[in-house]
């Protein structure tokens, strides 16, 4: 290299040869003393403090520090910040910081962690993903002890999302690449315990976001029809519109959507989110949500032949069978990044009222007795939610298409609950 080459080029050449020739302490919190002929000068926590500009060592060191922060060794320019700076969280990183991270190619075998795994969706999602990635590559976690069949079905560990250190240890020790964050208190339960809902749904989310950003994970956080409020368009509700929910559950989900989008733009976090409608699943008990009447009716119809609904018979809400929900979740996670025009999508399959659902069930179990005892809290929540979702962006961007409509849903649910004898008698 010519002796007249600029310092930046000379530094790059020397670093490429493995002999930078000096010690950098630019990122150290300690203070460094630089001794020159003009006397001692102090250098604080970051390069750029006032130091005698005529000192050649300082000028070269500052250029190297800038080059190291902006240009990773692999030669590509880093534009995102997926990791913490010396143990600090993304919330504490300087605004002008840039880092380079290792990303996982689509061909790599994913290592998956599911938080809140013993809720309505976690067990089914684990089973679904294990068929795709292998039994040992999908780890279910929760703070509760799992039933024996869940424990024996694949890896299960204790995980408290409010314990950041525990969460970080799990991600590191198990080489996690995808994280599905299902820990949350649902709508009606959250209203009964706002402080706990705030801790789980918001503080827990912050921990998950930080861990995912630090380790370059692909993160999925479900949202909900509850993220909308009474001032939102209800029929249909588009992806982008005013969102003013009136439950702590809804507020926390809007917060999750916006924080995930912020981390995507600010730190490069691969955040993906679906707004679920009411999800109907056969193999789980109702979890305290406003739409859980649509699950409870099948349990009660088969067990007792009677069902008391806590919503008005004409309350229309968007719904989806769990198989469609799980498939949509995997499809959006596997979608190429360039195909996604937004970070949060509506998805939908059907929309019905309690009366319409009961009428369809009566086709199979004519002796079913349905009564209505309206819960004013749940009814107020339902009246503030969408009646129909506009999911045209999901269908256009990554090819979403549902399989189950109301007749298929009812038949599948009743068959699962062992109602074949009742169906045969009715026929």
Show where each model-derived region lies.
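Amphipathic terminal alpha-helices
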Residues: 69, 74-77, 83-106, 111, ...
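Conserved Rossmann-fold NAD(P)-dependent oxidoreductase catalytic core, especially the SDR/UDP-sugar
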Residues: 175, 181, 199, 206-248
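Glycine/proline-rich active-site loop of Rossmann-fold NAD(P)-dependent oxidoreductases
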Residues: 254, 267, 279-295, 310, ...
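Flexible, glycine-rich beta-alpha linker
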Residues: 228-229, 244-247, 272-291
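NAD(P)H-binding glycine-rich loop region in Rossmannoid oxidoreductase-like domains
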Residues: 161-200
């Amino acid at each position: 290299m010519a002796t007249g080459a600029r310092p930046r080029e000379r530094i790059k050449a020397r670093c490429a040869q493995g002999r930078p020739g000096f010690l950098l302490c630019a990122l150290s919190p300690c203070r460094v003393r630089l001794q020159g002929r003009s006397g001692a000068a102090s250098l604080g926590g970051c390069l750029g403090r006032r130091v005698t500009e005529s000192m050649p060592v300082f000028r070269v060191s500052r250029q190297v520090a800038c080059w190291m922060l902006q240009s990773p060794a692999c030669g590509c320019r880093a534009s995102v910040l997926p990791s913490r700076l010396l143990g600090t969280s993304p919330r504490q990183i300087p605004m002008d910081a840039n880092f380079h991270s290792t990303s996982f190619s689509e061909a790599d075998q994913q290592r998956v962690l599911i938080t809140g795994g013993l809720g309505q969706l976690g067990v089914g999602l684990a089973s679904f993903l294990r068929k795709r990635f292998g039994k040992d590559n999908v780890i279910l976690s929760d703070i509760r002890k799992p039933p024996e069949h869940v424990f024996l079905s694949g890896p299960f560990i204790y995980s408290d999302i409010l314990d950041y250190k525990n969460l970080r240890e799990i991600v590191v020790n198990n080489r996690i690449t995808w994280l599905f964050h299902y820990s949350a208190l649902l709508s009606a339960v959250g209203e009964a315990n706002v402080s706990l809902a705030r801790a789980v749904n918001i503080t827990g989310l912050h921990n998950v976001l930080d861990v995912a950003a630090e380790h370059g994970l692909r993160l999925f956080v479900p949202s909900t029809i509850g993220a909308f409020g009474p001032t939102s368009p209800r029929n249909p509700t588009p992806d982008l519109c005013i969102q003013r929910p009136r439950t702590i559950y809804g507020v926390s989900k809007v917060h999750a959507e916006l924080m995930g989008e912020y981390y995507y733009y600010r730190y490069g976090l691969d955040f993906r989110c679906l707004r679920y409608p009411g999800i109907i699943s056969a193999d789980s008990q109702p979890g305290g949500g406003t739409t859980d009447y649509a699950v409870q009716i099948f349990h009660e119809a088969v067990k007792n032949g009677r069902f008391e609904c806590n919503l008005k018979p004409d309350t229309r809400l968007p719904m989806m069978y769990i198989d469609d929900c799980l498939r949509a979740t995997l499809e959006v996670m596997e979608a190429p990044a360039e195909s996604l025009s937004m970070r949060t999508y509506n998805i939908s399959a059907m929309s019905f009222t309690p009366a319409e659902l009961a009428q369809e069930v009566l086709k199979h179990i004519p002796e079913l007795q349905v009564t209505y005892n309206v819960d004013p809290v749940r009814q107020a929540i339902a009246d503030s939610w969408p009646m129909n979702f506009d999911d045209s962006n999901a269908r256009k961007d990554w090819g979403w298409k549902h399989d189950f409509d109301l007749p298929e849903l009812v038949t599948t649910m009743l068959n699962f609950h062992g109602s074949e004898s009742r169906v045969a008698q009715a026929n």
